Regions:
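N-terminal lobe/hinge region of extracytoplasmic solute-binding protein
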Residues: 28-116, 124, 144-147, 216
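Detector for C-terminal structural segments
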Residues: 32, 65, 81, 88, ...
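Ligand/substrate-recognition segments at binding pockets and active sites
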Residues: 45, 281, 390-499, 573
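Gly/Pro-rich hinge or "lid" segments in bacterial periplasmic/extracellular proteins
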Residues: 90-102, 147, 191-258, 263-267, ...
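Aromatic-rich, solvent-exposed beta-strand/loop patch
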Residues: 108-110, 132, 137, 178-197, ...
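Ligand-site clamp/hinge motif
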Residues: 126, 209, 242-292, 334, ...
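Surface-exposed binding/hinge segments that line
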Residues: 158-202, 218-227, 372-384
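Extracellular/periplasmic solute-recognition and catalytic clefts
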Residues: 166-168, 224-235, 260-324, 331, ...
Length: 609
């Protein structure tokens, strides 16, 4: 990107030019912006539809994380911060409503303006916006935050920055970004960059900051205490500037949020049963049905809440690293998927209670139709036919086992695929033409899913052993896992990729070729697919919802036929066991369910009578 000198030179010149062109093509400043259509909430909305504006404030909540932490800076690649920090302590120009596919309303910004093609976007800051130390948020803070995060921050911020042509101050409280390409989502993404305080980091390198260098934010909470790998305590800022904003009414109700760290999920759940933790999420339907009958539940001290949602299934499963042979061969990956006896595993571990994920966007209108591609989906994919994985156009579905432990038919099919790929069994071991045996290692993190994932791998390893394949399981703590995942140091690993009702630029970060070899990226499988790139481009340039849906369904086909992940269960409902004093608006749940912005944001504490 450009040097800071030239960026600020351009900012100054652009301010003069734009002042004279503000009346050119573009809508009037608005209170919100939607990816398609208009925002659902009017300019005078009182609160988010899933928040209780009359919720009482006070009390404390204790949540538990598995693993540890060695950083309190969630904006750089270095270190492992608690995942909750960014959303609770920092803010962006716009805030999201989680009851709409993708709509933003003013947070640090009081208004947003863009042109019909969305080649630029302009924000006007609220004059009352303040950092936690009481200093005002300035345009200089915003300009510095965008450039710093885009150039030296965590890789997740860099993709957006490469599409920014210019960023310029246009008035005392306003700035404009122009973009290098036709990508209608960029105007919304521009409103979702965290804003840091420039003066805190003057003369210092934010990427080299120690744990005591906690970034100042504008959010409702501040870090008040911590002990590395033990706990972090957040206190609600009594002088929080935005507490009366419509976007904030009925949210951030707890006086204190304490994050406790535990060695594994079993210890965390025992701490919950002992009353040391306020709530836990349960991802195993069998455990939910059979392990939550302890005395505190019977006494009414613990409530079991199920939170439905309307978002896509996303992808949860074991991702295969195609950077490493022989996982770069789709036939080997297909064989490994075929040998995974989901039906038997599901019945054994969950009592058959959790259906399997059938595609990345399954459970929503964005999910691919099964069978041959038709209509606009086929039109989008056909020009790329020579690059498509087998089954993309014809139709690909996950293999279905017979439900028995031996699963003979599926294993015979797996053998055929491995033979086609040049692997043969010799002396009980599957070897290639050079006589090298096939041995794989699955890397697992000691987190809330470790027990279930480990049990799955035990069953899977026995099936692969019958094929002559050795599968080893390696478990690491959070810090080790994060380092190895960032360097793609695994054959297989657990992947849980949540997907929204309005997928966009993040899809490039998940599946784009430019990120396949970039340390720390989310493209864990290392895929480099021209078809995936083209479908993402079609999504980003779609002018209407129908074209967007067709492009997303086409991308779904490319991802599934690529055979990159061994899918496991859907999580069609959130399961939360919590202290009965913790309440939420159960009559107005957001379409994204128990996701970002739900717990603890819209919950509150209500003392027992």
């Amino acid at each position: 990107m450009r040097s800071e000198f030239f960026r600020h030179l351009r900012a100054g010149l652009a301010a003069i030019i734009l002042a004279g062109t503000a009346s050119q093509a573009g809508a009037a400043p608005a209170h919100g912006i939607a990816m398609y259509g208009a925002p659902a909430l009017p300019p005078d909305f009182v609160s988010l539809p899933y928040a209780n504006p009359d919720a009482p404030r006070g009390g404390a909540v204790v949540t538990g994380n598995v693993g540890g932490f060695d950083s309190l800076n969630p904006f750089i690649l270095r270190g492992n911060p608690p995942w909750q920090l960014a959303d609770l302590t920092h803010e962006t120009l716009m805030g999201r409503s989680w009851d709409e596919p993708f709509t933003l309303y003013g947070l640090l910004a009081e208004s947003v303006e863009t042109d019909d093609d969305r080649r630029w976007v302009e924000f006007t800051l609220r004059p009352e916006a303040r950092f936690s130390d009481g200093t005002p948020v300035t345009i200089e803070d915003v300009l510095w935050s965008y450039e710093t995060l885009g150039t030296t921050g965590h890789p997740r911020y860099r993709g957006f920055w490469t599409k920014v042509d210019s960023i310029a101050q246009t008035g005392p409280r306003s700035l404009r970004l122009t973009f290098t390409e036709d990508d209608r989502e960029l105007a919304l993404l521009a409103g979702l960059r965290p804003i840091l305080q420039k003066s805190q980091w003057e003369g210092r390198d934010i990427t080299e900051a120690g744990i005591d260098d906690i970034p100042l934010g504008t959010g409702p909470y501040v870090v008040s205490d911590y002990e590395i790998n033990r706990h972090v305590t957040l206190k609600r800022n009594p002088d929080y500037w935005g507490r009366d904003l419509p976007l904030r009414r009925g949210t951030n109700n707890f006086d204190e949020i304490r994050i406790e760290f535990y060695g594994d999920d079993t210890v965390l759940k025992e701490a919950f049963k002992a009353g040391l933790v306020s709530y836990v999420r349960e991802f195993n339907a069998e455990a939910w049905a059979t392990q939550y009958d302890f005395p505190a539940v019977a006494r009414g001290e613990i409530t079991l809440s199920e939170i439905p949602h309307g978002k896509p299934s996303g992808m949860t499963g074991f991702v295969m690293n195609t950077r490493r042979p022989p996982l770069d061969d789709w036939r080997v990956r297909d064989a490994l998927i075929t040998a995974f006896n989901f039906e038997y595993i599901n019945d054994t571990l969950t009592g058959g209670r959790q259906p399997r994920i059938t595609s990345y966007f399954s459970g929503s209108e964005l999910g691919m139709d099964h069978g041959p591609a038709t209509g606009r989906v086929r039109d989008l994919l056909t020009p790329l036919a020579d690059t498509l994985p087998p089954g993309t156009l014809e139709g690909y579905s996950l293999p279905v086992g017979d439900g028995t432990a031996r699963n003979r038919t599926a294993l015979r099919r797996a053998v055929d695929l491995l033979n086609e790929a040049g692997w043969q069994v010799q002396n009980g071991r599957l070897v290639n033409a050079e006589g090298t045996p096939l041995s794989l290692t699955v890397l697992l993190q000691q987190d809330g899913l470790i027990a279930q994932a480990s049990a799955m791998m035990d069953i899977y390893a026995r099936a692969l052993e019958r094929l002559g394949i050795t599968l080893k399981v390696e478990m690491t703590d959070k810090a080790q896992y994060a380092e190895r995942e960032a360097q793609f140091d695994f054959d297989l690993t657990m992947m849980r990729r949540s997907l929204s009702l309005s997928p966009g630029n993040e899809q490039t970060y998940y599946w784009g070729a430019d990120y396949a070899d970039q340390p720390g990226s989310r493209n864990l499988m290392g895929m480099k697919s021209p078809a995936a790139e083209a479908m993402i481009r079609a999504m980003l340039t779609a002018r209407d919802r129908a074209e967007f849906v067709a492009a997303t369904r086409a991308l779904d086909r490319v991802l599934m036929a690529g055979r990159y992940v061994i899918p496991i269960h859907q999580y069609s409902v959130g399961r939360i066991a919590h202290k009965s004093q913790l309440k939420y608006p159960d009559d107005r749940l957001p379409i994204y369910g128990d996701g970002i912005g739900f717990l603890p944001e819209v919950w509150w504490f209500e003392a027992n009578e």
